[in-house]
């Protein structure tokens, strides 16, 4: 269907698998099955009009254990330069490629699996794109330019503090 691009959709698709010989197969969440099981997962970026969507980037996700297994990589012919990247890192790479290719822009739409990643949201903003992201209820989001107070100074005893602090002027 014709019409202007309204959104760039980041999502992943899982493919249930029996056995462990296909590239990237691991016990991980499989959306098709609604539970953890052996599957492959691909991260995609699709462009959407009001009536239709079309995937423009698609990349197989390699779980960390699989990406680090030299024997499996060699058997499958996975090039050395391919290293582990999280799903949000793959998504941000795809968005950067779409911007570099001059694809028609739209707001980036992502579910909580991607939207909860601060670096992804920040990267999308740095590219001058707006986004609509699902986030977990316990995630603090700060207005642009507003920052939390830093953790308390370390007293020299115990573990160094790492929790951010809030006060009247520092609120998410």
Predicted regions and their residues:
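Active-site-proximal, Lys/Arg-enriched surface segment
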Residues: 1-64, 74
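An internal, acidic/charged active-site-proximal segment
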Residues: 70-172
